């Protein structure tokens, strides 16, 4: 498993490549500001998903054990990284409106559910499910 600092170094490169003025420009004036927000947020969230409170390292371990599936996209693989999610989808990508979410919660929450409702009713169960997978032989 990568140490936190090595993981963060790789993630900062990855997240910098995802910055788009069109998509993120409202809340982040440039790529460096976006990357700095990401670094501060991932540390504040202790490398855990905002919704299910599961460590990205536990999620990566489950992926490596083939207990969780990933999804290939045109820009990489969804699953082994925390993703930038808008708490209120109708609002833009701003520091106040964004959190880091695992792929599984982000995909599940989609644009349909309120972030706090999702966190309360689904996040806790997702965490229990991940714990179940960790203990499953």
Predicted regions, residues:
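Short coil/turn linker and secondary-structure boundary residues
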Residues: 2, 29, 93, 112-113
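Short, charged surface segments at domain edges that flank catalytic/cofactor-binding sites
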Residues: 2-54, 59
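Short, intrinsically disordered terminal segments enriched in charged and Pro/Gly residues
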Residues: 6, 15, 123-137
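Charge-dense, low-complexity polyampholytic segments
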Residues: 49, 121-124
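Histidine-centered nuclease catalytic patch
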Residues: 54-98, 109
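Short Cys/His-centered divalent metal-binding micro-motifs
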Residues: 57, 98-120
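Short Fe-S-cluster ligation motifs
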Residues: 87-101, 128-137
């Amino acid at each position: 498993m990568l140490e936190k600092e090595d993981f963060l170094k790789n993630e900062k490169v990855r997240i910098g490549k995802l910055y788009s003025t069109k998509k993120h420009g409202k809340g982040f004036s440039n790529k460096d500001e976006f990357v700095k927000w990401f670094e501060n947020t991932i540390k504040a969230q202790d490398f855990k998903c905002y919704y299910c409170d599961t460590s990205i390292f536990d999620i990566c371990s489950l992926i490596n054990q083939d207990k969780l599936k990933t999804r290939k996209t045109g820009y990489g693989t969804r699953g082994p990284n925390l993703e930038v999610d808008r708490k209120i989808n109708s609002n833009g990508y701003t520091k106040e409106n964004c959190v880091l979410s695992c792929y599984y919660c982000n995909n599940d929450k989609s644009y349909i559910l309120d972030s706090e409702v999702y966190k309360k009713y689904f996040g806790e169960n997702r965490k229990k499910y991940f714990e179940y997978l960790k203990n499953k032989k």
